Amino acid sequence: MRQGMILGENGEKMSKSRGNVINPDDIVREIGADAFRVYEMFMGAFDQAIPWSTQGARGCYRFLDRVWKLQNLLTEEEELSEALKASVHGTIKKVSEDYEKMKFNTAIAAMMSLVNEIYARGSVTRGELRALLLLLNPAAPHITEEIWQQQALSDQPIYRSQWPSYDEKAMEQQETEIAVQICGKIKMKLMVPSSYGKEETERFVLENDAVKALIAGCLLYTSPRPRD
């Protein structure tokens, strides 16, 4: 349950007289219950009044679609790959702590970042997919259970499986935390390889699903340099 208020897309309180009421049944029919749940958890802190964004909700649908298509990249390897070991353990820690603190928006953002890393690598092990699905299950129970069963990731349902644990030593990697600021406000933080330069960092941030959802419908403008 949200403690804050979901406003209409125009930023005003929803009411029939204003014509800005969002019917959840219509949203579920369009993008499904899982995407609806994920967006409600991702759209912002639970104690804040936040305007509804149809584009943002569709962005969460696209995120879950990418999770579904990870099955096309699945290998037979049961363990974590060396390339993603640090990221997976870091994501487990981040999501676990954020769930405990009810910071669901940043937990979802962390999982979106992990999915981006998996696609950048081009493959996902069974161990990596298993960890991701366990983390995502509280937010998207239907699609995660479906993938879990299709890929036979365990002999029991996902909701009865043990929550993943993380290893602090495995998280040691040369990364830098950067703050993503939109319209003058810090919206989220991302871990970026320390070796990245300015252009690589910008590309990494703009290709992140969480950032895409936050800037959906926004016009990005870079002011020209002043003339000498």
What feature does the model see in each segment?
Residues 6-7:
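Catalytic phosphate-handling regions of large nucleic-acid enzymes and associated NTPases
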Residues 1-3, 172-176, 217-218:
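A short, compositionally biased
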Residues 221-228:
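Conserved small/polar residues in nucleotide/adenosyl-binding loops
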Residues 195-214:
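A short, contiguous, amphipathic alpha-helix enriched in charged residues
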Residues 21-25, 30, 205-207:
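Extended active-site and interfacial segments that coordinate phosphate-rich ligands
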Residues 14-15, 187:
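Generic structural signal for well-ordered beta-strand positions
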